[in-house]
């Protein structure tokens, strides 16, 4: 688990200080992936450096597996860092070493005996799908394959957490999908707590269990990913699964409906309309993939006379989650447009 408590980082001397991280709180449980998103200058890179204490926070704590790294001396901090695997946009591979030799480096530095190193490297390359490429040099590998070598190296010392800082930036869509798929496997198989820092919103829906939005050094939104997608007021949800094609509600009450496409019957709208005895108007819809699962969003226009409890019950029985939109959309006549 990763726990960041009131994490603050400032530069300069008072009164001319610049605050890059401002009392930031974030928890990444074991066996989960939390994505941190935000514009350039939001503080994402500084956050990554503070998690590993490559940059020491001005105040606050960085707790990894129950241990506050900010309270450790140099020797114990080196030991604690072994529990944090890191992967970056640059794979950082040594060009004159093979894939196997690159993965072996942390084991060699730690003094692991050769026989155990060989066995561990073979396990790791197999884990990341590169068992047949152990003797290849970095220039003989694709960008996605090099990043997989970097992941194998990050796992060499059996960390409990993994920090991914823009690790998929610059990769083509196929390579990106393979890396996010691998991270999900590592989450499930090894129970890792993964902090996934990125500016690529399309990647978030493929990998994250939760998402936090960072702006000006502060977390302004943080929630499980599906909750973010269900929130019509969420800027992150709107960016990840846009509400496309919303039409006129004609004086109807607007409802937002969310669902996992694989669990919902194709005729849910017509079936619910027949059951309720009211026509439900489809104003807009979109479908996407979130962490490997199909999810959808629909905007409905619902007659004001319809009992909301009956509507939610009818949709719940079909595997849909519904909530009213913040306001009722007036008809064109009410707006004096006709």
State what each model feature region is:
Residues 136-139, 157:
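Conserved signature/switch motifs of ABC ATPase nucleotide-binding domains
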Residues 162-165:
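Catalytic Walker B motif of ABC-type/P-loop ATPase nucleotide-binding domains
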Residues 15-18, 69-85, 109-114, 228-232:
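ABC ATPase NBD coupling module
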Residues 52:
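Helix-to-loop junction immediately C-terminal to a conserved catalytic motif
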Residues 37-39:
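The feature captures the beta-strand-to-loop junction immediately N-terminal to the Walker
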Residues 68, 104, 108, 115-132:
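Conserved ABC ATPase "signature" region
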């Amino acid at each position: 688990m990763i726990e960041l408590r009131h994490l603050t980082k400032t530069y300069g001397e008072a009164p001319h200080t610049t605050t890059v991280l401002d009392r930031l709180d974030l928890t990444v449980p074991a066996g989960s992936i939390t994505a941190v998103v935000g514009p350039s200058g939001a503080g994402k890179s500084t956050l990554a450096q503070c998690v590993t204490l490559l940059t020491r926070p001005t105040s606050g704590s960085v707790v990894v597996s129950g241990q506050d790294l900010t309270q450790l001396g140099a020797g114990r901090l080196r030991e604690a860092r072994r529990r944090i695997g890191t992967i970056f946009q640059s794979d950082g591979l040594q060009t004159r070493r093979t894939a196997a030799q690159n993965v072996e480096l942390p084991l060699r530095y730690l003094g692991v005996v050769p026989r155990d190193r060989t066995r561990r490297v073979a396990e790791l390359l197999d884990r990341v799908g590169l068992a047949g490429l152990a003797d290849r040099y970095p220039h003989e590998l694709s960008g996605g394959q090099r990043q997989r070598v970097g992941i194998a190296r990050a796992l060499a010392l059996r960390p409990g957490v993994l920090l991914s800082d823009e690790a998929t930036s610059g990769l083509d869509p196929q390579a990106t999908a393979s890396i996010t798929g691998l991270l999900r496997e590592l989450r499930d198989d090894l129970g890792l707590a993964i902090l996934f820092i990125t500016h690529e919103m399309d990647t978030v829906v493929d990998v994250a269990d939760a998402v936090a939005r960072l702006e000006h050094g502060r977390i302004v939104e943080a929630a499980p990913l599906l909750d973010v997608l269900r929130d019509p007021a969420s800027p992150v949800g709107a960016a990840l699964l846009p509400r496309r094609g919303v039409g006129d509600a004609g004086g109807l009450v607007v409802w937002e409906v969310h669902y996992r496409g694989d669990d919902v019957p194709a005729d849910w709208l017509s079936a619910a309309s027949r059951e309720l005895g009211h026509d439900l108007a489809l104003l807009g819809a979109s479908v996407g993939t979130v962490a490997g699962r199909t999810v959808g969003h629909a905007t409905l226009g619902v007659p004001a006379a319809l009992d909301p409890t009956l509507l939610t019950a009818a949709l719940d029985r079909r595997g849909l989650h519904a909530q009213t939109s913040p306001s009722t959309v007036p008809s064109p006549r009410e707006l004096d447009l006709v």
